[in-house]
Amino acid sequence: MKKVFTVYCLLLFIGASAQRFPDAVFLPNIRTAKLFSQNNQESMAIVRLNSSDLLELHFDDVDPTPKNYYYSLELCNADWTPADVNTFDYISGFTQVHLSEFRPSSITQSRYIHYQTLLPNKNCMPTKSGNYMLRVFLDGDTSQVAFTKRMFVVDYNKAMISAIVQQPYDNQLNKTHQKLQLSVNTMALNPINPQQQIQVVILQNYRWDNTCLLYTSPSPRD
């Protein structure tokens, strides 16, 4: 028996309490840190598990002196707290990867260095689906974090999601709200306690500062 979780909600776009670990920049010399699907700067940082999907990481350092930046990937829970799992249970390869591709600015009044890379790669490959925190840090020292970014590894063989956006029945909400009919087919997941294990997070234009967090009850279907 497959289980389908159906949710009807009005998107109020209020901040969710699960927002504990936002994307952040920690060094003042870092500018325009971006992480997105390859060749699509407007996309979220999502890759399919065991696929050839790639993400592009870009950022500028306004200090014109080249530095040794590294990145790491950490599996997180639904609320973006670190998962209590050994790194090598979800990463194949190294725990840190050196960012070796960079170039100095040219024909600009302000000097800076642009760093970029494609990930994941064979040096650091996620082996489990889930929420991942990308950390960029200096000199292989994880205490010198430059910035963090969220990314997602998805497995469509485990669950499928479908959604229909509709106008609210209340005319007073037509211009400010949306009604969402959402179905999550867990297929191979078979959660034991779906009320705790299944969470749905709604984003408005990829924004994390006003997420809508939903908890659902199962509706079994054959």
Regions flagged by a language model, labelled:
Residues 215-222:
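Conserved small/polar residues in nucleotide/adenosyl-binding loops
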Residues 128-139, 203:
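Internal, hydrophobic beta-strand segments that form the core of beta-sheet-rich folds
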Residues 93-112:
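Extended, solvent-exposed segments with strong compositional bias
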Residues 63-67, 126, 189-195:
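A short beta-turn/strand-edge loop motif at beta-sheet boundaries
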Residues 1-21:
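Bacterial Sec-dependent N-terminal signal peptides
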Residues 115-121:
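Ligand-binding face of N-terminal immunoglobulin V-set domains in extracellular IgSF glycoproteins
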Residues 24-25, 153-177:
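Low-complexity, Pro/Ser/Thr- and charge-rich linker/hinge segments at domain boundaries
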